[in-house]
């Protein structure tokens, strides 16, 4: 069974569950992506900063699947923001991936100190007009960044990929996304593993005969989030995709949501200006 599709504001759609390859060493990436595609995944999320675009692309090319069957996402790194730099960085990414178009291209971080994300997004829009990108979006954008971007370009991003897990459910940002028509995508959806042994999560999982990771992925799905769990273990990759045959109850959802404590595992987008 394939992942459900989430409709985007530009008429395209994205598989709700994908494989993320953040912090996946290049030597492990090809094997992980191959295992995911064999398990039924049709959505792979990488980034220039991950250093594994080449291996991601090679696994897709060797999978036997047509390019059109795999939803491919990568991200522009902070040091490459700006109109002309973005156009060059895009060409470098698709060259490493061995493809001629992207399904979704994201600005990795707003980098407020540089204040180049508007010009960067204008370059994204040009690439979309040229048929090189199907959908354009952002990552780690806070409400103030989204408002500036939309007011300046007249374009609403299709996706905002943000840190999101039960400890940091991002309610206000998700509500804003819903108002604006932006799809919410979760990175570190399992809380970088910190929630897998939590008794609340394991209790919900056991009541459905599922793993803690499966329960957390299902929690995201029922909130409407796109979710990209990361793993290099083929069995876990397969298990993380076995989430379409059960449903959490309202009580299950509330129990997992009650774990919120505003814990942020990654940098704060308001102050993260790293470009190295």
From Swiss-Prot:
One Pfam family cited in the UniProt record for this chain: Aldo_ket_red
SUPFAM superfamilies, per database record: NAD(P)-linked oxidoreductase (SSF51430)
The keyword Transcription regulation belongs to this UniProt entry's keyword annotation: no
Enzyme Commission code: 1.1.1.-
Catalytic residues, chain numbering: 50
Binding site for NADPH: 190, 228, 230-232, 236, 239-240
Keywords: NADP, Oxidoreductase
Entries under InterPro entries matching the protein: AKR (IPR020471), Aldo/ket_reductase_CS (IPR018170), NADP_OxRdtase_dom (IPR023210), NADP_OxRdtase_dom_sf (IPR036812)
Entry GO MF terms: aldo-keto reductase (NADPH) activity
EC primary class: oxidoreductase
Family: Belongs to the aldo/keto reductase family.
Name of this protein: Aldo-keto reductase Mjls_1919
UniProt source species: Mycobacterium sp. (strain JLS)
